[in-house]
């Protein structure tokens, strides 16, 4: 089976146009591609036919008497020149066709919502109890809540002013905006969150992995929509290397150009890495604190799956992250991302959002995507099925925990009025062995 987008373009172009319309993209790409594809197939047929004639002439020339051989050789020489020119034309058209094919986003699953302007996601389910002020209750729907007289302090002020364990001012002076110094007990909390997520997921059969933090251009362009994200990722000056924006990129590339057999799948990985992001489109959003920053640590689930199993795995990895967040004691919701906001690689994406009581709103903490064969086609990762049928594998990714963002959620949901932050119980076993680490509570740092 060939690449699903290519199959759909050839066999059901109207469906692809519907997908592009749902994604709010230009549908004229379909007709442009079909024209190129038709031309490429016609030329390729001509090349194959001409090569067959050339091969026949070569065989005939080898057996022909000397007086006929010269004539045959001359014909073969003319055919070879024509064949060479035609092959160059085929290569040129093929490159144009391939470039255009790469510009197509993934197809979308039937359950992906097509939404009106101003709506980016549809809530699927809720977990936990949110703290909310009385005057904000009307904004909540299908949510279990408790009314509080006083809302907690926002995570940015809590981390920097009350606890004194984040310093964005000094980081801004020496590195620029959206950088930070993480200090004291929040450092241990960052480590504990990563170990908690890695341990839980490893127990579920995910293989721990730390990927390279940089990838070559020829590789990174295959794992993400490079034209869209060119300005969002960092390039190493003077090197053919880009910093990864998530462990997903490096893990996907781990099987670059791999040929698998059916019994090897699924392959489950849980990766940890720093993530480097320019946040070029963020503007003035979340300038305070460590919610939206240029570098952070993240645990990532990644699955290489048989095509028929990928939708089951999509639900599975989403539930894995739900469990991590639920067991931390953070109120959350799962939302189904609208077609226009999916991003090119995903056929469907869930976001898991956590309630921030100081802001009285849910904020994204994790994303879980089924990328189907969009990445594997570009990376050349195939599986040979029984009967020797070859297919592209499906790839899926899902945040385990992004540690700094999870810290911000803990600071708002677990703080007391005296400025003390309770450490979620599930994290305490990961802090117990470390003598210098906090165990039950994080106390404001005493000012001298």
UniProtKB/Swiss-Prot annotation:
Main location as per UniProt: cytoplasm
> How does the record describe its quaternary structure?
Homodimer. The tRNA molecule binds across the dimer.
Binding of ATP occurs at 277-279, 293, 364-367
Similarity annotation: Belongs to the class-II aminoacyl-tRNA synthetase family. Type-1 seryl-tRNA synthetase subfamily.
**Which GO cellular component terms are attached?**
cytoplasm
Family matches, as InterPro entries: aa-tRNA-synt_IIb, aa-tRNA-synth_II, aa-tRNA-synth_II/BPL/LPL, Ser-tRNA-ligase_type_1, Ser-tRNA-synth_1_N, SerRS_1_N_sf, SerRS_core, tRNA-bd_arm
Q: Name one Pfam family in it.
A: tRNA-synt_2b
Phylogenetic classification of the source organism: Archaea, Thermoproteota, Thermoprotei, Thermoproteales, Thermoproteaceae
Alphabetized UniProt keyword annotations: Aminoacyl-tRNA synthetase, ATP-binding, Cytoplasm, Ligase, Nucleotide-binding, Protein biosynthesis
| EC category | ligase
The UniProt function text for this chain reads: Catalyzes the attachment of serine to tRNA(Ser). Is also able to aminoacylate tRNA(Sec) with serine, to form the misacylated tRNA L-seryl-tRNA(Sec), which will be further converted into selenocysteinyl-tRNA(Sec).
Where in or outside the cell it occurs: the entry states: Cytoplasm
**EC number(s) in its UniProt entry?**
6.1.1.11
Output this protein's name.
Serine--tRNA ligase
